[in-house]
């Protein structure tokens, strides 16, 4: 791209995918290659790299101007930037005896405005989408729109995603919806046993629920961002799964399967266990294939843009430590949860403690600040009014077994 810009090469169109994951700095170069630009992405999924770090710096209440000036004047940005930005004048002002409280106050206000613009430019795609949405509301000419029709997933899954993240705006493609609602088209089944009664549900979401950590007498299974009990459940479920190609020779297309977890340590542990149990070889013999790459388990971040016929999720977190962000961590990151919950086509099996999420969602601190968590729990927890109305999730309680 650098060479194209240097040689003043122009195209009729520039099309950029995954624009929501790119920072404004990364988008500038391709934007310069044409006067017509199409940006495709989802700002409600994974953000640009280091967005959280950048925002934490820009949102600080106090500013150390000496560090700011030194970093730009003497750091890797040195050249003409100091002169053309006016930082040389700011440096002289900071070292003079004329710096009074009014000047500092005015300086702070100016810097805050600059930082606000910097945040906007760093998360450029998000800013453009939100601007477009405001224009649509005001019936003004808009520069963008939401792609509302979804073709990928079971309508139960899309209902959850649409309600949690997209203001109930997603629409299921009719033929796709009918295909997923017809359980005979699902290309896999499970051999039932006492571990997972009624696991062959027609629901697009199945939750294998570990009991509430407040209600048992053994130590929590979560340890250092791993959860061995969840891993045992996943191993067992993969032993029981069968492809319908084994039962029907006409259907011999490999079924894509993937296990996801928010935490790298859990991913590493699961992949190690899969090697020990020869899980990949066994599922391949039964007509399944890994949806992406060589490892059956991946982190959520590494699977954005991916999809599989069946997704199994390991949530890991299983405690009631305070504060809430220490207890739930990743599970409170709505954008990453959006990615995790929207990868499955036919079915998503979630392994984790829904009781724990319900416990937290009933906590006043969560109700005040964690709307996403409360809403998701109410849609999925058995016996809640909303869950009974929606009927999108089949819940199977799993009793702890100390193997």
Place the predicted regions along the sequence by residue.
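Helicase C-terminal subdomain and adjacent C-terminal extension
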Residues: 53-142, 320-403
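Conserved helicase/translocase motor-coupling segment
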Residues: 162, 168-272
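Catalytic acidic motif of RecA-like/P-loop NTPases
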Residues: 20-21, 44-45, 301
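Conserved helicase/translocase P-loop NTPase motor core
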Residues: 1-12, 232-236
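SF2 helicase catalytic motif II
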Residues: 8-23, 38-39
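Conserved P-loop NTPase nucleotide-binding/switch module
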Residues: 30, 34-66
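Conserved ATPase-coupling elements of RecA-like P-loop NTPase cores
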Residues: 2-5, 19-28, 48-51
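Conserved helicase C-terminal RecA-like lobe
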Residues: 240-258, 265-342, 354-360
